[in-house]
């Protein structure tokens, strides 16, 4: 009986007194607390799982939309719009990389980063063509101021010639180079290859150094002009060689040397042709000779030598 009394329910006096003082107070048991905690844990855990599932579903939908989105055709404007989607900092960084080439620094890998653009090459070529035509005309204007006997007339055709020359060089030479490297890639399995747009981008940015060089050619001193021309050519050609070397080094030494020599030679011909054509010495038809007094013929009688006839 004593054991049964011990197992019977006993009311504590303190609890009874507290309930008597605050009859409206709610009471909870330990089992209720455990139940509520489990319920909260289940709700929180289910919320996290639901959020993760929603995130995964959104990622799947995004990837599916990207896959289902049709790629624009190469003859449409949308296809080329992505190549002009660059900001000023990217263009300035690529210009800086073309002006400061050094061995082991690949312009394509360090500056293009598999994102070639046409914005920089397009405007660099346009600026170079315009500067060539303007400075070529300014050379004649300055020469006329030094020698008034020189007759100057604006040569607007130089704008067209400069534009055709620069744009053809910036597109046709990279096209030929890319085609040759692609052909050599079929014979050499380990040989890498740049894309056509990467090659065009490299050539376009390599022409930027000629813009300040052409402006400095306004100095009317021949040896200074040739010095700045050689310096600009060296920087531009070095950038091309350092960029193309990782691609051609897997080929034979003869082919690599011949290819790089051809690249430098074509670059030198461009610079030399611009120097000799747009800054050439004045032709003879631009120089008007000063009028000179022609001596009279000895058979012609001057008025003072004619004597009046007298009659006797």
UniProtKB/Swiss-Prot annotation:
Species for this entry: Mus musculus (Mouse)
Family to which this protein belongs: Belongs to the YIP1 family.
Lineage: Eukaryota, Metazoa, Chordata, Craniata, Vertebrata
Gene: Yipf2
A Pfam family assignment: Yip1
PANTHER family: PROTEIN YIPF, PROTEIN YIPF2
Membrane-crossing segments per the record: 122-142, 161-181, 194-216, 229-249, 254-274
MF (Gene Ontology): small GTPase binding
Intervals, Lumenal compartment: 143-160, 217-228, 275-312
Main location: Golgi
Entry protein name: Protein YIPF2
């Amino acid at each position: 009986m004593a054991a049964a009394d011990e197992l019977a329910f006993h009311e504590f006096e303190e609890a009874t007194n507290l309930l008597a003082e605050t009859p409206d107070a709610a009471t909870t048991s330990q089992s209720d607390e455990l139940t509520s905690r489990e319920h909260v844990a289940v709700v929180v855990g289910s919320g996290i799982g639901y959020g993760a599932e929603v995130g995964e579903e959104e990622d799947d939908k995004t990837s599916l939309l990207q896959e289902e989105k049709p790629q624009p055709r190469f003859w449409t404007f949308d296809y080329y719009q992505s190549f002009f989607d660059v900001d000023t900092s990217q263009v300035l960084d690529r210009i800086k990389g073309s002006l400061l080439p050094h061995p082991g620094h690949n312009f394509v890998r360090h500056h293009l980063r598999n994102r070639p653009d046409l914005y920089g090459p397009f405007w660099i070529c346009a600026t170079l063509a315009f500067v060539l035509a303007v400075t070529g005309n300014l050379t004649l204007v300055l020469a006329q101021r030094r020698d008034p006997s020189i007759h100057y007339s604006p040569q607007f055709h130089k704008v067209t010639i400069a534009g055709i020359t620069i744009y053809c060089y910036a597109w046709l030479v990279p096209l030929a180079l890319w085609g040759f490297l692609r052909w050599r890639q079929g014979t050499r399995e380990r040989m890498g290859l740049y894309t056509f747009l990467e090659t065009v981008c490299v050539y376009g940015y390599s022409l930027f150094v000629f813009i300040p060089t052409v402006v400095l050619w306004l100095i009317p001193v021949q040896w200074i002009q040739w010095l700045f021309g050689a310096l600009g050519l060296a920087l531009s050609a070095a950038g091309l060689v350092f960029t193309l070397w990782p691609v051609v080094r897997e080929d034979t030494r003869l082919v690599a040397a011949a290819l790089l020599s051809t690249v430098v030679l074509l670059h030198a011909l461009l610079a030399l042709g611009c120097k000799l054509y747009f800054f050439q010495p004045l032709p003879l038809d631009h120089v008007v000779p000063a009028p000179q007094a022609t001596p009279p013929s000895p058979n012609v009688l001057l008025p003072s030598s004619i004597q009046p006839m007298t009659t006797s």
